[in-house]
């Protein structure tokens, strides 16, 4: 009888062991997880100080979130965040600085798919451009590094970035698709002193499609935006001050010389050389089509209000027809020139190479009226 009770008790205990959940202190052995799933787990990395750039560049593919905190990038070195893993999130904190050296740059490079780059509220990328500024920009003098290469980005976002005192051009956007940039600030106002800063373009765009830039504030000494090639580009709700306004081109002389379906909307252009400009290269080929400027306000333009030139690189020559400008729309454009030294509207087209233009609600005052416009399209006038 005792043996039977012991046997029954043992059987019940065995069943209980099988049915009971595993003891947390002694977990049950489970099948090893798939290696690919482990690789996808979130890893947060923080890099800072003088070794931060080097460590970030070496370890970037091990991190899904990268914090760059008060990084001091050594001279002649790129903060290289190219070829990031899909979905990587990059966050700037504090002040990012760059050592001095005469070289072409860039100071920062980012590429990848589904990338997010952003700055925290106190973050600043400080180029300390006065160390390079000599009044010559990229045309001579010291060799100056370009600032930020947003090249080969796909389905990505750059937001809330504050850049101060770039040595020369700021954002180069090239080979990118479906890139959104919001709340970008470039403050190069220190370069206005003695006209020392030059060629400090805010956004240079080439060979890219579906680029959207909104909420930008650009204070610089060259084009706020220059679209050299690309399609489906949208720039809106922004301020451009002190530079060369909203530009298409120069178009011509590159591997890709097509600009198509571009919209500038709701932009204020202040104290700039001109507000609206299309520039194509004499003797070259390409095309500019479906470009719209809508709801643009500008004040105190110094050289031109609106300027279209098909001989941009040599205005002494008769404009050529190799880069036609078609389907060009200006709608609700209101602005002022600083004084009579500013030409309100200037158009220099090749014979028959500017067509299908529609201008409505365009008003430019305070400057002089040009008598030298060439081949003005039907329905358009240089005397508004």
UniProtKB/Swiss-Prot annotation:
Positions bearing carbohydrate: 261
Catalytic residues identified in the record: 222, 244
Subcellular location, principal: secreted
InterPro entries given in the database record: Glyco_hydro_28, Glycosyl_hydrlase_28, PbH1, Pectin_lyas_fold, Pectin_lyase_fold/virulence
Family designation: Belongs to the glycosyl hydrolase 28 family.
Disulfide bonds: 45-63, 224-240, 349-354, 373-382
Catalytic activity: (1,4-alpha-D-galacturonosyl)n+m + H2O = (1,4-alpha-D-galacturonosyl)n + (1,4-alpha-D-galacturonosyl)m
PANTHER family for this protein: POLYGALACTURONASE (PTHR31884:SF1)
Protein name, entry field: Probable endopolygalacturonase C
Species this protein is from: Aspergillus niger (strain ATCC MYA-4892 / CBS 513.88 / FGSC A1513)
